[in-house]
Amino acid sequence: LDPNTRPNTKFNKDGVCFACENFNKEIKYYDEIDKQIVLDKLIKKHCLKNKNSFDCIIGVSGGKDSTRQALWVRDKLHLNPLLVCCTYPPEQITKNGADNLSNLINLGFDVLVTGPSPITWKKLLKESFVQGNYLRAPELALYSSLPQIAIRYNIELVFWGESPAISWNDTKTLRNEPYDGNALRNSSTLKNCDLNWMNGIIDNEYKKIPYRYPTEKEFTENTIQIIFLG
């Protein structure tokens, strides 16, 4: 059940949300071969330029879904991925979470774990709550980590799991192609990635770096392409 008070939601004349509409279309018209052809073209465009780098980045939590994605990209697509996990140890990581990441490492993956300062995190989490969206700061750090690292490592292709538009009706993240994730900055939580709300809470600009989502210009200059696998 999705209320119409949720930001960026969209319903048709029958009261069905965009995510449910899309689900019904996928069930009816799903074509795995078609999707594979599109994916192969994107891989050829973004992954075959620099053999001294990883082919792509995959955002992982270490859970069952991201483990499956990592194995699928490596073993089915035959790519060499760098796995990236944004976390907040020790207070936000469970033993199961640590074991899951260890499992990915034991499966032979290169895994990069990044975590912003816990002190900064707590201040921003509180301010996010006061301003009415307690997930804003954590999701800024989470979603910023992948394209930031992609730019630093000269990697063009970034794989995420599910599309916010197709999975939970955040339609402002939608672009012309359903797999295209380059409009994530428009999600209801990220709100175009403006950091001015942190002023007065975080005084040192360098402390904001983990929360700075790369600009559209940076995406274009570095040919960054986010793809939803979900």
Positions of PLM-derived features:
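Short, glycine-rich nucleotide/cofactor-binding loops
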Residues: 56-65
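Nucleotide-activated chemistry modules centered on ATP-dependent adenylation/adenylyltransferase
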Residues: 1-57, 72-230
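Hydrophobic positions on the alpha1 helix immediately C-terminal to the Walker A/P-loop
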Residues: 68-69
